[in-house]
């Protein structure tokens, strides 16, 4: 009887090991990005959403030189993607202002970033060469105009660094 129990326990252990190997965590980017980044390697991912669904989620995905060329080509025709530099509305949401700045309407403003990391600093590094993406999930549009004036913000933003071949993506739900 004990040999049967041992055999069953061994089979159960093997089954659990196989199941955990097959059913590992998969990280999927927001569908609103409209691009396939599955050929990249996830360098970092965390989800800070709470029980009510508010919070921030972050992805960092690196690409090989070959895959980066194909990925960059897809960004050129995907909805919501633009070559850098960022427009001012998106820049304010992602990085805030550096001290007090004169806005386009002539007013002086100081804005903290909305999309921040766990330490409160901007979630994305500053990038000189690449592409950016923004999708306002509340209006289902690819513009950041008016987002800061709302009592809640729900958006997905991403920047792709052509030099390091890295995609940074973040989602904010408030």
Predicted regions and their residues:
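Gram-positive cell-envelope targeting signals
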Residues: 1-26
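Sparse, context-dependent recognition of short Cys/His-centered cofactor- or disulfide-binding micro-motifs
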Residues: 3, 8, 44-46, 143, ...
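Extended hydrophobic/Leu-rich segments
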Residues: 8-10, 16, 75, 109, ...
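Short, well-ordered helical secondary-structure segments
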Residues: 10, 48-50, 147
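N-terminal export/targeting and maturation segments
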Residues: 19-88
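Functional cores of ribonucleases/endoribonucleases
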Residues: 82-166
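Conserved beta-strand-loop-alpha-helix junction that forms the acyl-donor binding cleft
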Residues: 170
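Short, solvent-exposed mixed-charge patches
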Residues: 173-174
């Amino acid at each position: 009887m004990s040999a049967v129990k041992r055999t069953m326990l061994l089979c159960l252990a093997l089954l659990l090991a196989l199941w955990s190997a097959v059913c590992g965590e998969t990280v999927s980017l927001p569908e609103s990005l409209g691009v396939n980044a599955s050929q990249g390697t996830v360098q970092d991912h965390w989800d800070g959403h709470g029980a009510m669904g508010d919070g921030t989620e972050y992805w960092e995905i690196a690409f090989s030189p070959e895959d980066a060329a194909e990925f960059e080509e897809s960004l050129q025709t995907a909805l919501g993607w633009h070559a850098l530099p960022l427009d001012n509305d998106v820049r304010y949401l992602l990085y805030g202002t550096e001290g007090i700045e004169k806005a386009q309407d002539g007013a002086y403003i100081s804005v903290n970033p909305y999309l921040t990391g766990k330490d409160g600093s901007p979630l994305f590094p500053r990038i000189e060469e690449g592409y950016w993406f923004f999708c306002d999930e509340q209006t289902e549009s690819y513009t950041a105009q008016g987002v800061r004036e709302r009592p809640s913000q729900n958006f997905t933003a991403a920047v792709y660094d052509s030099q390091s071949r890295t995609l940074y993506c973040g989602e904010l739900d408030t």
